[in-house]
């Protein structure tokens, strides 16, 4: 049973990011935002570590770790010195957009909670924006007002027909 489950998972359909209707340019925008967020986290994290305040140092180390994780997930070719970089990137690609959004936004909020400074806010802004972009893709494309009104009209007609049938059945 475990062998068939592993074979089914390996031969499964395309990653959920494609199933959710992300266009190629939006996917690249999310990846670019992730790489830029990693660079901003790394630079701000280094500046944050140049202090004597322990919470600033902890936030700076967390930001550098965020930068590494963002690069590992969004641009594994930048981390080829890590043997498992491609494996991690493939697993992250299989995550749904809302899961990536929660993960990236959560990673970006932790250093801000540790040390609320301008450096941590600016350094984590792009990383947080990456999570927001993935969250927006999880919401998906919404229909226009005309098609929504048409669907509502069809539902209303179906409800009226059901109501008429129940009245006819009682008489």
Swiss-Prot record:
The portions of this protein that span the membrane are 32-52, 57-77, 102-122, 125-141
Q: Please give the residue ranges for the topological domain Extracellular.
A: 53-56, 123-124
The record describes its membrane topology as: Multi-pass membrane protein
Taxonomically, the superkingdom here is: Eukaryota
UniProt-annotated location(s): Cell membrane; Vesicle
Summarize tissue expression: Expressed in neurons in the brain (at protein level). Expressed in neuroblastoma cell lines (at protein level). Expressed in cytotoxic T-lymphoocytes (at protein level).
Q: Which GO terms describe its cellular component?
A: plasma membrane; vesicle
Q: Residue ranges, Cytoplasmic compartment?
A: 1-31, 78-101, 142-171
Q: What happens when the gene is disrupted?
A: Viable and fertile. Results in lowered susceptibility to skin papillomas induced by 7,12-dimethylbenzanthracene (DMBA) and 12-O-tetradecanoylphorbol-13-acetate (TPA). In cytotoxic T-lymphoocytes, leads to a complete block of early cytotoxic granules (CG) endocytosis at the immuno synapse thereby impairing serial killing of target cells. Does not affect cytotoxic granules exocytosis and global calcium signaling, however increases latency of CG fusion and endosome recycling.
The record ties this protein, via InterPro entries, to: TVP18/Ca-channel_flower
> Is Nucleus a UniProt keyword of this protein?
no
Where's it mainly located? membrane
Protein's UniProt name: Calcium channel flower homolog
């Amino acid at each position: 049973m475990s062998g068939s489950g592993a074979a089914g998972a390996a031969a499964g359909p395309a990653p959920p990011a494609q199933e959710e209707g992300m266009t190629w340019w939006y996917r690249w925008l999310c990846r670019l935002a992730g790489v830029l967020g990693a660079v901003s986290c790394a630079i701000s994290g280094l500046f944050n570590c140049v202090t004597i305040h322990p919470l600033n140092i902890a936030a700076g180390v967390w930001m550098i770790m965020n930068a590494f994780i963002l690069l590992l997930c969004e641009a594994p070719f930048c981390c080829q010195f890590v043997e498992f970089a491609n494996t991690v990137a493939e697993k992250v690609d299989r995550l749904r957009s809302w899961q990536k959004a929660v993960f990236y936004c959560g990673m970006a909020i932790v250093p801000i909670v540790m040390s609320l400074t301008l450096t941590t806010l600016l350094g984590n802004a792009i990383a947080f924006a990456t999570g927001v972009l993935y969250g927006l893709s999880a919401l998906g494309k919404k229909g226009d007002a005309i098609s929504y009104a048409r669907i509502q009209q069809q539902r209303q007609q179906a409800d009226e027909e059901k109501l008429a049938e129940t009245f006819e059945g009682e008489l």
